[in-house]
């Protein structure tokens, strides 16, 4: 089974760009690494805004399928995690009075989240440092995105999950992660760049 690396943060915090950079930096070290971008982005693009908590089941299953497709690699990088649908489900409901069905769905998602947490070897949180620009897919504005950031952190802390906050430019963030993974040795540069990484990501997705 691969070492699983999850890069987490709210919408438009730079996590997808970071996994592209990290993927490149690991490939040029001749590491057997696979990457998958979050399933929910494709879901939102194809089906529109999520309106019901039950849709988080589909997000969970889609993300699980993506992550299982990386089992052949030594390292598996994602910018999401299968426990995040629970966080979003809880966030969607907010403080409103919950129906019996909503409570049961939230319980199911929580059980799945707790079951899946141990499979991640490294969890990194990416704080919002570069401002917020809408991408035409996600519905959240910056204020909501910041609230999602807090919801993710609250979950990690409430469940005593070990995670590392990664700051700096995209390149600096990637280098810090490599150091934590003990992969920061000097290497001979190869002709691989972020454009190539983006093409590989498109092929894999």
Where are these regions (language model features)?
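Pre-Walker A (Motif I) flank of P-loop NTPase domains
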Residues: 1-4
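Hydrophobic anchor at the beta1->P-loop junction of P-loop NTPases
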Residues: 7
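Walker A (P-loop) phosphate-binding loop of P-loop NTPases
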Residues: 12
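Hydrophobic positions on the alpha1 helix immediately C-terminal to the Walker A/P-loop
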Residues: 18
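Conserved substrate/cofactor phosphate-moiety recognition/catalytic segment
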Residues: 23-65
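Conserved nucleotide-sensing/catalytic segment adjacent to the nucleotide-binding pocket
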Residues: 48-97
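A glycine- and Lys/Arg-enriched "phosphate-lid" helix/loop adjacent to the NTP-binding pocket
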Residues: 92-171, 176, 196
């Amino acid at each position: 089974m691969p070492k699983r690396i999850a890069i987490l943060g709210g919408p438009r915090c730079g996590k997808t760009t970071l996994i592209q950079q990290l993927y490149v930096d690991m490939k040029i070290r001749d590491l057997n690494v696979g990457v998958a971008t979050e399933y929910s982005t494709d879901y939102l693009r194809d089906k529109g805004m999520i309106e019901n908590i039950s849709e988080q089941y589909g997000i969970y299953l889609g993300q699980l399928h993506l992550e299982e497709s990386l089992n052949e690699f030594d390292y598996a990088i994602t910018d999401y995690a299968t426990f995040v649908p629970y966080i979003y489900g809880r966030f969607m409901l907010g403080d409103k009075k919950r129906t019996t069905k909503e409570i049961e769905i939230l319980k199911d998602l929580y059980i799945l989240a707790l079951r899946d947490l141990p499979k991640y070897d490294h969890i990194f949180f990416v704080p919002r440092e570069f401002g917020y620009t809408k991408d035409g897919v996600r519905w959240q504005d910056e204020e909501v995105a910041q609230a999602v950031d807090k919801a993710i952190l609250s979950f990690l802390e409430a469940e005593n999950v070990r995670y590392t906050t990664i700051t700096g430019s995209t390149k600096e963030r990637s280098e810090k992660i490599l150091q934590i993974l003990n992969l920061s040795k000097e290497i001979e540069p190869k002709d691989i760049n972020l454009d190539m990484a983006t093409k590989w990501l498109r092929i894999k997705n």
